[in-house]
Curated annotation (Swiss-Prot):
Any one annotated GO CC term: endosome membrane
Gene3D superfamilies, per the entry: 1.20.5.110
Residue intervals passing through the bilayer: 132-152
Protein name as catalogued: Syntaxin-8A
Amino acid sequence: MNNNNNFNSNFNSNRISSTQPYLSDDARNALFEGKDRKWGNNNNNNYDTLSNQDVFEKQKRDMEEQDKMLDALSGSISRVKDTAITINKTAQEQTDMLDELDVHVDSTSARMRNTTKNLITLTQQSKTTGYCSAICFLLLVLLVIIILASVL
């Protein structure tokens, strides 16, 4: 019991006295703008002055307006869906074209490598062929000189 009294005394320590409310009437009116309820506005309910038939008609109009908004939203969603489908088709077509291009680039790269190897081989052979032809030419000249020397 002593613990409970200690809790109550700590809980009420912000009050001037335990019998006084936290806020004076003036402070409460200033805070809540003169309303007798803690939350919200007293005029929140638009149906207070309407008859049952009027409430029904108002709710029916509200529902019709909401249906129109939902129809417009549905149309917008359908257009977004159609656009997304078109984008998907275009992206798929471009992906296919890129795949085909990749295959062509790979085959062209392989042919370029082969051609480069062939050119390197040809260049090396042409260097050797030049030496062989020079040797043959010099042997021919030597042979001509030997023949001319033997004749004279």
